[in-house]
Design a protein with these regions (language model features):
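Subset of outer-membrane beta-barrel
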Residues: 1-343
Length: 343
C-alpha cells in the first residue's frame, strides 16, 4: 500500500496497552519507516515489541522473589511493486523472537526464534461516477506469517506460527473536494490446523472363551486402553505448509465449524480535507472460537506533516474480555508531502 502513498517517506510509532483492567505493564509498541523509492516501488522496515511486564516468581516461602520479563519481538523489511496503475503486490520478510521462558524455573528453556513471510496484493481504483455518486473501489488480500514452526527447547513441542489469510474491500464515497466517507469489510482465517477431538480405545476380548466379551484388565485391575487416538478431526502433527491447506477442512464439527473459524470486521471513516477523520468499526468472532466481539471508535488529526490517531475499544461480547476499554495511540511524521499525486 505504501506504493500508493502521496508522501515520499514517513516514520510512525504506535503504542497499545493491554489488559489494563488487570495490570499496568503489558503493552505493544511498533516503529515503522517507509520510503517510496519512485513511481513504481516502495520499501518499509518495522520493529514490533510486545512486553508481558514483570512476573514475580516465588518458589517457596523461604526463597527470595525472582523477577522475569517475558517478551516477544519481530523485525520486518518489506518491498512493494506497482504492477499496474491501480494494482500492486508486496512481500515482507520477518524475523520473530519469542522469549517466554521462565529461567528460574526451567534453566534449560531458551528463547525461540523463527522467520516468516507475508505476501500481499492491493487494488486502488480510479475515481469513477456511479450514477449520482462519485467513488473509488479498493480491495486487498494478504497471507501473513508463512514460515516454519517455532519451539522453545530441543525436546519441546513445535508450535505453528499464527499464519493468517485476510481479504478485504472498501468503497470511498467522494462527496466533494473536501469530504469523503469510506466503508470497508474484511474477513480473516487462521491458517493452522484445528486441534482434533481425542479419545481412547479399550480392549474387550473373550478371555475364557465362553462366548462373552470380558474387559481387558491389567495387573493393577484397570481397563487396558490405547494411547489417545483421534475421535474427530485430523492430526495436527503436520508441517506448516500442509497445515495451511488442512486448515480449510479439518474442523471436527465439519463444514459448519469451518465457517465459524472465519472472523469478520466492518469499518467506516469520515475524512475532511485529509486533515481530520472520525472512525468506527466492529469485529466479530464466533462464540465457539473465542467469542471476541469489539466495537471501536477513533479519530485522526493531521497538521503540517504530522498525523495523530487515537482509538478506543469496547467489548460487545457476553463473555468479559480483558482487552475491553483499550486505548490505542499512533503518531506518524510525513516527509515530502504531496510529492506524488494519485488522484
Amino acid at each position: 500500500k505504501y506504493v500508493f502513498s502521496e508522501t515520499k517517506s514517513g516514520f510512525g510509532l504506535s503504542y497499545t496497552p493491554y489488559l489494563t483492567k488487570l495490570v499496568n505493564d503489558i503493552s505493544l509498541g511498533n516503529l515503522t519507516y517507509f520510503n517510496r523509492i519512485n513511481e513504481r516501488s516502495a520499501f518499509a522496515v518495522s520493529l514490533r515489541y510486545f512486553s508481558l511486564g514483570e512476573i514475580e516468581i516465588i518458589q517457596d516461602e523461604f526463597s527470595q522473589a525472582l523477577i522475569e520479563k517475558p517478551n516477544e519481538m519481530t523485525m520486518d523489511i518489506s518491498y512493494s511493486l506497482r504492477l499496474a496503475d491501480q494494482f500492486s503486490m508486496g512481500v515482507a520478510l520477518r524475523y520473530l523472537r519469542s522469549d517466554l521462558r521462565i529461567g528460574s524455573v526451567d534453566p534449560d528453556a531458551k528463547a525461540a526464534s523463527s522467520f516468516g513471510v507475508d505476501l500481499s496484493a492491493y487494488y486502488q481504483g480510479e475515481e469513477q461516477n456511479f450514477g449520482d455518486i462519485d467513488g473509488r473501489i479498493r480491495a486487498g488480500a494478504i497471507i501473513q506469517n508463512l514460515g516454519p514452526k517455532i519451539k522453545y527447547d530441543e525436546s519441546g513441542r513445535e508450535t505453528f506460527l499464527p499464519t493468517n489469510l485476510r481479504i478485504g474491500g472498501g468503497f470511498d464515497f467522494l462527496l466533494d473536494q473536501y469530504n469523503t466517507v469510506s466503508v470497508t469489510a474484511e474477513v480473516n482465517k487462521l491458517l493452522v490446523p484445528t486441534p482434533p477431538i481425542l479419545g481412547r480405545e479399550y480392549n474387550f476380548s473373550d478371555i475364557n472363551e465362553n462366548g462373552v466379551y470380558d474387559d481387558g484388565i491389567d495387573e493393577l485391575g484397570e481397563l487396558v486402553s490405547t494411547d489417545p487416538v483421534i475421535y474427530q478431526g485430523q492430526s495436527a502433527d503436520v508441517d506448516f505448509m500442509s497445515g495451511i491447506f488442512q486448515s480449510f477442512s479439518d474442523a471436527p464439527g465439519g463444514f459448519s465449524e469451518e465457517l465459524k473459524e472465519f472472523t469478520w470486521a466492518l469499518g467506516a471513516e469520515y475524512k475532511y480535507d485529509d486533515s481530520f477523520a472520525l472512525r468506527a468499526g466492529y469485529f466479530n468472532e464466533s462464540e465457539e472460537k473465542g467469542a471476541r466481539k469489539f466495537l471501536a471508535l477513533g479519530a485522526g488529526f493531521k497538521f503540517s506533516g504530522t498525523k495523530v490517531d487515537l482509538s478506543y475499544l469496547f467489548s460487545a461480547s457476553k463473555v468479559p474480555s480483558p482487552l475491553e476499554n483499550t486505548l490505542r495511540f499512533s503518531l506518524t511524521f510525513d516527509f515530502g508531502s504531496n510529492e506524488y499525486l494519485e488522484y
